């Protein structure tokens, strides 16, 4: 069994929490995999299935909670504290502190967006990058979310439209509609399902204020700072080997993901049949095989 180590990295006077899966039988040919979670502010727990690569192939796997969430939670900050550069600079700080100078990179959702920003800035020491359901343009993401909503029952569409109008997503009707959307396109389970993944519950419990500031009140509208997200030109400069990973039932729809695949030079793409946004929650084996199959080519 992998030895799980926990540590903290100093960052801006705060502490960034890191969790490291150290293989019992490490393969020296396998470079470490650094995993970036989504949100911003969703924390690392829901991606822990990728830690299984430590036992399976002898690969070191590193997770961290980005500043402002989970075990890297901080006191309330003014909105201008939370910027893209906050997490970009943290990425390089964590790597330097942990000696991660020769790695593979994985990012889910916002984590993939963050990874793209970092690879556009400085890709030194990154051998490959798996971009898991991450948009290069937020408006495409929103247009597709609105298209997916039209396949839901009319009363649920109406409830979410009313929630968007009032800003109140806490009504029973809006909660039920959001749960249905999350079951179909995000988690793959209803909140009331006894099989709802514990790792997702733990991530939800650790969400920080940065989610509301950057994203907004829901997955269907972006009212925060990410509303102008568009890196279509920037990703053309990414030089390292990349693979997009997404699901057919993903809120990051194939149309959304293809936009990035077409722009990132020589980007490959693995599309998992029936998988939602958190594909590893419903299709863990397919995700592990896809990720290891890609990154092992660049060890």
Residue ranges of model-derived segments:
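N-terminal cap/lid segment of alpha/beta-hydrolase-fold proteins
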Residues: 1-15
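Conserved HGGG/HGGXW glycine-rich cap/lid loop of the alpha/beta-hydrolase fold
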Residues: 14-74, 78
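Active-site loop/oxyanion-hole signature of alpha/beta-hydrolase fold enzymes
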Residues: 63-110
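Conserved hydrolase catalytic core segment
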Residues: 101-144
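Flexible "cap/lid" loop of the alpha/beta hydrolase fold
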Residues: 129-168
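Alpha/beta-hydrolase
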Residues: 150-151, 158-240
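Conserved loop-alpha-helix segment in the C-terminal half of the alpha/beta-hydrolase fold
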Residues: 232-275
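Catalytic active-site module of serine/aspartate enzymes centered on a nucleophile-bearing elbow/loop
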Residues: 266-299
């Amino acid at each position: 069994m992998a030895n799980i180590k926990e540590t903290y990295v100093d960052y801006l006077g705060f502490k960034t929490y890191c969790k490291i899966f150290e293989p019992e039988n490490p393969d020296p040919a396998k470079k470490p995999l650094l995993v970036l979670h989504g949100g911003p502010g969703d924390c690392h727990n829901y991606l822990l299935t990728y830690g299984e690569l430590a036992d399976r192939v002898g690969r070191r796997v590193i997770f961290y909670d980005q500043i402002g969430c989970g075990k890297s939670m901080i006191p309330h900050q003014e909105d201008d504290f939370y910027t893209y550069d906050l997490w970009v600079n943290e990425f390089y700080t964590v790597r330097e502190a942990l000696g991660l100078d020769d790695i593979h990179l994985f990012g889910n959702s916002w984590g993939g967006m963050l990874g793209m920003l970092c690879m556009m800035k400085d890709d030194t020491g990154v051998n490959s990058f798996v971009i898991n359901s991450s948009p290069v343009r937020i408006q495409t993401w929103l247009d597709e979310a609105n298209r997916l909503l039209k396949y839901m029952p009319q009363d649920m569409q109406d409830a979410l439209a009313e929630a968007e109008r009032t800003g109140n997503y806490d009504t029973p009707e809006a909660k039920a509609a959001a749960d249905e959307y999350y079951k179909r396109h995000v988690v793959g389970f209803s909140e009331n399902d006894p099989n709802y993944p514990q790792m997702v519950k733990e991530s939800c419990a650790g969400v920080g204020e940065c989610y509301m500031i950057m994203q907004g009140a829901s997955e269907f509208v972006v009212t925060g700072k990410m509303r102008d997200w568009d890196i279509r030109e920037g990703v053309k400069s990414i030089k390292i080997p990349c693979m997009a990973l997404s699901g057919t039932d993903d809120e990051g729809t194939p149309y959304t993901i293809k936009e990035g695949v077409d722009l990132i030079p020589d980007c490959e793409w693995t599309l998992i049949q029936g998988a939602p946004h958190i594909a590893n929650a419903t299709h863990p084996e397919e995700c592990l095989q896809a990720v290891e199959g890609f990154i092992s080519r660049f060890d």
